[in-house]
Amino acid sequence: MKNNTEKLIYDMAFRVRLYIASKISEQKVGDLTDRETLILELVGMKGNMSISEIGSLYPTVSNSTISTTITRLWKDKKLVDKRILPENQRVTTVSLTEKGKKVLEEIKRTQAEVFGTVTVSLGLSPDQVEYFQEILENAIGFFDKTLGLNLDGS
């Protein structure tokens, strides 16, 4: 790590991932991997997405791995639907099933509880909360720009 700020960001991100994974596991939201959860969240935010759109957000993951993950969400877990576009049969779109929407809502509820607990435990003053929110909005903007995301303010 180049400096203390980078180390702190890494350490925080690692702990957040562990904390969320443990809370989601406790809630029995479903036996989902990180990648499966992220795909559900992406499709939930953006609506129908092609498999290639989803894959473009994972540049270091092969298209076959993304496709296999989506097939598992579709065939085994019944959380997404796959549909071949009639006008271009080379394109398969993915959308959430009703079961997928329910699982996603439970994931969001669990995450809201986790982040709510963390926010309260920080003991920030109203001014600090406002500043913290600005920092988070800037970080979100950076990641959206870097990843080419357009999640409509989500």
Feature locations, PLM:
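N-terminal leader segment of winged-helix/HTH proteins
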Residues: 1-31
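Conserved segment of winged-helix/HTH DNA-binding domains
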Residues: 6, 98-117
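A structural signal for well-ordered alpha-helices, especially hydrophobic packing surfaces
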Residues: 13, 17-20, 104, 140-144
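N-terminal helix-turn-helix DNA-binding core of bacterial DNA-binding proteins
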Residues: 21-62
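Short helix-coil-helix linker/hinge
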Residues: 30-36, 97, 122-126
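A cross-family signal for key residues in well-ordered alpha-helices
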Residues: 41-42, 105, 133
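Canonical helix-turn-helix DNA-binding module
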Residues: 47-92, 98
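Terminal interaction helix/tail motif
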Residues: 109-154
